[in-house]
Amino acid sequence: MNLIQTLEKEQFDKLSAGRVIPEFGPGDTVIVNVKVVEGERSRVQAYEGVCIGRSGGGINESFTVRKISYGEGVERVFPLLSPMIDSIKVVRRGKVRRAKLYYLRNLRGKSARITEKKQDRPAKVVAGAAE
């Protein structure tokens, strides 16, 4: 490992220590709680939308969240390890076949929906059936 990779790994470990970053990807609906500073006041604002892509890696990783606000599409790019992000919560998992969902920008209404990924539950073991 060269010097730059070593320094990036140290910074990544330092920034990600004590914070929970859930596993999520394109198609997942997420709520990002962002710290907003207005004058001297600070508050947390929730931003809910569909993750349309992740880019970068390590300390430079970021993700893009798209939502429809008052009929207008709004996209916001968040650095994954930003100190302005209070928390990230995955609301639902989406079933998609692409890494970047930029095609959603041109879709409206029902065609822009993403089907939910079904979670496979383990089969219940019935006592006495294995005999």
From Swiss-Prot:
PROSITE patterns in the record: RIBOSOMAL_L19
InterPro entries per UniProt: Ribosomal_bL19, Ribosomal_bL19_CS, Ribosomal_bL19_sf, Translation_prot_SH3-like_sf
Assigned keywords, A-Z: Ribonucleoprotein, Ribosomal protein
GO cellular component: cytosolic large ribosomal subunit
GO BP terms in the entry: translation
GO molecular function per UniProt: structural constituent of ribosome
A Pfam family assignment: Ribosomal_L19
The UniProt record lists the keyword Disulfide bond: no
Superkingdom as given in the UniProt entry: Bacteria
Keyword 4Fe-4S: no
Function: This protein is located at the 30S-50S ribosomal subunit interface and may play a role in the structure and function of the aminoacyl-tRNA binding site.
Family: Belongs to the bacterial ribosomal protein bL19 family.
Listed PANTHER family: LARGE RIBOSOMAL SUBUNIT PROTEIN BL19M (PTHR15680:SF9), RIBOSOMAL PROTEIN L19 (PTHR15680)
Matching NCBIfam families: rplS_bact
Protein name in UniProt: Large ribosomal subunit protein bL19
UniProt source species: Rhodopseudomonas palustris (strain BisA53)
Phylogenetic lineage: Bacteria, Pseudomonadati, Pseudomonadota, Alphaproteobacteria, Hyphomicrobiales
